[in-house]
Amino acid sequence: MSDLPLLPISSASTIASCASLPLCISDVFICSYPKSGTTWTQNIVHKLLSNGVKNLEHISESAPFFEVDTHWTGEATLSPSVVAGHARANGGRRVFNTHLLWSMLPRARHAARYIYVVRSGSDVAFSFFKHLSSQRGDGGWDIDTQGGWDVFFTAWLSGEIPYGKWAAHVEHWMSAVDAEQRCGI
């Protein structure tokens, strides 16, 4: 699945940086197919790491979207805003939110932990439709030019939307070999 369709906010150079980021043993990746409960899980992880103290304006300060171009300044170098957010929100511990596949993420033996969140496919499909429909012009789903729910659902089933087929994404993650570093929710 190396040809995974992505949002326009993720360039090939950013995806390469994502894969080559040097890991720390304390890194946490909150992973999912879009609209599967990532934000909910980000909040839980932040509460655990901060002992319940909410010291941020938005959860993305604690767990930024990993594959966004603006979060990188060069090859495998996180932007100063991401580094500052981690320092402020997590005491320097790095937490990321991502929809990339297991095979696209940095890995090293005994380094980092990966939480994979799964939600019912039917719930995900409708939630993703509503989410992308609200982002017309930003890589979202334009109902006026692309069609409504029926057209979106067909594209979702065939994997012609960002992050591809839901079932293939889940299967890819569930078949990952390094299970000791991965927790499914």
Regions found by a protein language model. Name each.
Residues M1-G184:
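PAPS-dependent sulfotransferase catalytic domain
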